[in-house]
Amino acid sequence: MKNQTNTNKYNLTNDVIKKEVDDILKGKYQQCVLGTLNQNGYPYLSKTLPLYYEKKIYLLLSDLSDHTENLKINKKVSIYFAQEEIHKERLNNPRLTLLGLIKKLKLNKNDELFRKLLKNYILFD
């Protein structure tokens, strides 16, 4: 009997996984949540719309937002992406969580990077 290749998600090649992650970062998701820690160490989560450009994730955060206040204390963030729920068992639906440190950039509407970010921003269905 020949060896049969199992094509489930657990046996994907690194190239396939990299492509799926890249697709998610480029906008193939339904929801995205940013997580920061408040001054008491509690997680604070809210929906966000990241901008993905040149292999970097950019977030537009108001100086008045709770996340901005939290990031003054702790630069650690988590970003959670959820794709369309296609499986009956909800825990089996595609998702991606990224952890990292955030860096603040001061941009205004006339900055070239800001214009490029908006130009490359993908709107979803």
Model-assigned labels for residue ranges:
Residues 1-125:
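Binding-site signature for planar aromatic cofactors or substrates
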